[in-house]
Design a protein with these regions (language model features):
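Membrane-interface alpha-helices
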Residues: 75-89
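Short, flexible helical or helix-coil boundary motifs
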Residues: 14, 33-37, 64, 84, ...
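Long, charged low-complexity interaction segments
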Residues: 1-17
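Charged, low-complexity interaction regions
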Residues: 17-20, 39-45
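N-terminal alpha-helical modules
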Residues: 19-22, 27-29, 68
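Amphipathic alpha-helical packing elements
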Residues: 44-79
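Short amphipathic alpha-helical segments that mediate assembly, nucleic-acid/protein binding
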Residues: 4-7, 23-25, 35, 54, ...
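A short, structured beta-strand/loop element
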Residues: 29-34, 41
Length: 90
């Protein structure tokens, strides 16, 4: 698990302005995107590199600043779409 100091370090290297999302959102993203590391050798693309992992999180946050928000981010949107698709099938 990465911590706030890791997020601050990465954000400084990547010159992130934090005008559309917070450092906490960024940290949440880094920790979620660590799934692309050595946790699974078949899907390891970052090799647990903080900066590469941070770039993945940053890419998602740049296109959708609420991407990692648990209340209304991507996960909730996916659940909404799944419900809609299930209703269409029935």
């Amino acid at each position: 698990m990465y911590n706030i100091n890791d997020a601050i370090y990465a954000s400084r290297l990547l010159n992130i302005p934090f005008n559309k999302f917070s450092i906490e959102d960024f940290l949440e993203g880094i920790n979620i995107e660590s799934e692309h590391g050595s946790i699974n050798e078949l899907t390891n693309v970052t090799n647990d590199d903080l900066i590469i992992t941070s770039k993945i999180a940053l890419a998602h946050l740049n296109e959708y600043p609420n991407y990692y928000n648990k209340e209304y981010g991507l996960k909730k949107y996916e659940e909404f779409l799944k419900t809609k698709l299930n209703n269409v099938k029935n």
